[in-house]
């Protein structure tokens, strides 16, 4: 299981599992060893937790399974990672520490099963920093694991990572590669990786006829039972595109303004202000995080399917697939904090990398954490700069996931960061779901907002189809990186966070000085006493 299994909430996950089981077809084993049912039961199960437990039992979810392939008997254990949980704001389950849960499960396997190999399917992931890389930590802490098949971080490992006798492999994102590996058992019973490759899943791969027929039938169902309600068909062309949009990978690797984020955030404002149900309250800022974006737009025709695939996650309170746009108000001080979340937090949590329309800022990556932003202001469509007033309320539009995710980021800061969405009167919002932008009795979905924006572009070549404007061929100073190590640039414009951190450092230094002073004083006293004894 991964974090996006919870995008459709507990009921959605339960429905998926129950539908799969009820299909009568052979379903794959589902393994996850660190759901903390004991803790959940102590607190009393809510309705969502009851639904998931019932679905888990009906499907047959286990901590691990034993698979016999030829002469080899292997145990496969599954685990849900820490960062995955942070990225699942709608998940109602509690989880044990991944390492401890896997360690306990492996001990159980060793005790009760006579297996030749232990493999772990992990939604923990790998990072560049080995000390924070969840699956590398797992490999070191649970050395009895022979193979970790790693997910979550979309890492495309061209070569396996090895720690001791444990290998970690990962084939990237969205089924674009098929991982293939071979292992040979050594005399001591452990396994050696003898071959490993990532095979691209491209159009060159001939589709299986029966599978393709089933996919086509399901696609027809999507048209009839879902897209028709929005007035679209799957293959309908929304716009023609000659712009080279940033790749999805770049949203995770580049910490700067990207045109893919620009067009999506602009779409939010357009859709709200051009809805027939628009209440006339101008949108000041729209925010899109990288964590919700699932695909880019290639050159050529952009279809409804392309747009839906680019923002396909989630579900609204209405029970219809797709995250809705929500409307809320933040103070100017909180808007500046939004910029600081991107500048300071998103390198540790790339799903929190933010792309804004209406909010421009500059940051220096070399400055103190939580004080990296050096300039922050609003802009209008004509590019006019508008200074932010700290105590003024500003109208912000984003998708439901973003609102929930920013709440998770605030929790992770242990009170250092405080951002409280409000209604237009300044009252705190109790439930973000209630802030969904409605068109009569229907939620305005984020993907639909993008589709409408695409359709709104001018038809510049006269063929009756909109064209993506040249505006998106370049960036527009929405997120400026000031790569300076100049001492003045590093310390100018200190905020409360830098003062707080500086104060903590000063206290730490004072404590060290006092400790050193006391130790030296004690040493001098001891020497004086010894001297007096010797003189006697």
Model-assigned labels for residue ranges:
Residues 87-93, 172-536:
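Catalytic centers of hydrolytic enzymes
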Residues 1-204, 264-267, 329, 346, ...:
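Acidic, metal/ion-coordinating pockets
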């Amino acid at each position: 299981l991964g974090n996006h299994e919870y995008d459709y909430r507990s009921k959605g996950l339960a429905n998926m599992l129950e539908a799969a089981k009820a299909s009568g077809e052979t379903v794959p084993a589902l393994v996850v060893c660190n759901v903390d049912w004991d803790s959940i039961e102590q607190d009393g199960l809510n309705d969502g937790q009851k639904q998931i437990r019932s679905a888990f039992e009906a499907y047959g979810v286990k901590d691990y399974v034993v698979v016999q392939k030829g002469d080899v008997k292997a145990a496969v254990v599954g685990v849900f990672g820490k960062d995955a949980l942070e990225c699942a704001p709608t998940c109602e389950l509690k989880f044990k520490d991944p390492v401890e849960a896997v360690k306990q499960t492996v001990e159980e396997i060793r005790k009760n099963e006579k297996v030749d190999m232990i493999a772990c399917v992990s939604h923990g992931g790998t990072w560049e920093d080995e000390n924070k890389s969840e699956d590398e930590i797992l490999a070191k802490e649970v050395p009895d694991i022979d193979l970790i098949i790693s997910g979550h971080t979309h890492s495309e490992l061209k070569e396996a990572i090895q720690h001791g006798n444990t290998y970690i492999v990962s084939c990237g994102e969205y089924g674009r590669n098929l991982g293939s590996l071979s292992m040979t058992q050594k005399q001591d019973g452990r396994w050696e990786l003898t071959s490993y490759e990532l095979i691209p899943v491209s159009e060159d791969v001939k589709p299986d006829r029966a599978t393709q027929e089933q996919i086509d039938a399901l696609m027809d169902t999507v048209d009839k039972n879902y897209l028709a309600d929005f007035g679209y068909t799957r293959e309908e062309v929304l716009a023609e595109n000659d712009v080279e949009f940033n790749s999805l990978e770049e949203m995770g690797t580049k910490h700067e303004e990207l045109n893919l984020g620009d067009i999506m955030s602009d779409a939010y404002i357009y859709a709200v202000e051009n809805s027939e149900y628009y209440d006339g309250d101008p949108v000041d800022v729209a925010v899109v995080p990288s964590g919700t974006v699932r695909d880019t737009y290639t050159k050529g025709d952009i279809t409804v399917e392309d747009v839906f695939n680019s923002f396909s996650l989630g579900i609204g309170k209405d029970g219809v697939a797709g995250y809705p746009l929500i409307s809320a108000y933040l103070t100017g001080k909180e808007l500046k904090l939004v910029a600081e979340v991107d500048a300071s937090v998103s390198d540790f949590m790339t799903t929190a990398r933010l792309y804004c329309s209406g909010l421009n800022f500059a940051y220096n990556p070399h400055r103190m954490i939580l004080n990296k932003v050096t300039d922050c202001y609003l802009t209008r469509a004509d590019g006019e700069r508008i200074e932010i007033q700290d105590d003024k309320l500003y109208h912000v539009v984003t998708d439901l996931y973003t609102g929930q995710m920013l709440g998770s980021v605030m929790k992770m800061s242990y009170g250092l960061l405080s951002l409280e969405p409000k209604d237009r009167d300044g009252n705190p919002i109790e439930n973000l779901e209630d802030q969904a932008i409605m068109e009569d009795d229907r939620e305005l979905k984020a993907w639909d907002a993008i589709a409408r924006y695409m359709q709104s572009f001018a038809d510049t070549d006269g063929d009756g189809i909109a064209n993506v404007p040249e505006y998106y061929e370049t960036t527009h100073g929405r997120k400026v990186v000031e790569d300076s190590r100049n001492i003045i640039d590093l310390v100018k414009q200190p905020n409360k966070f830098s003062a707080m951190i500086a104060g903590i450092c000063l206290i730490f230094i004072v404590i060290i000085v006092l400790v050193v002073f006391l130790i030296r004083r004690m040493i001098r006293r001891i020497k004086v006493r010894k001297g007096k004894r010797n003189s006697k």
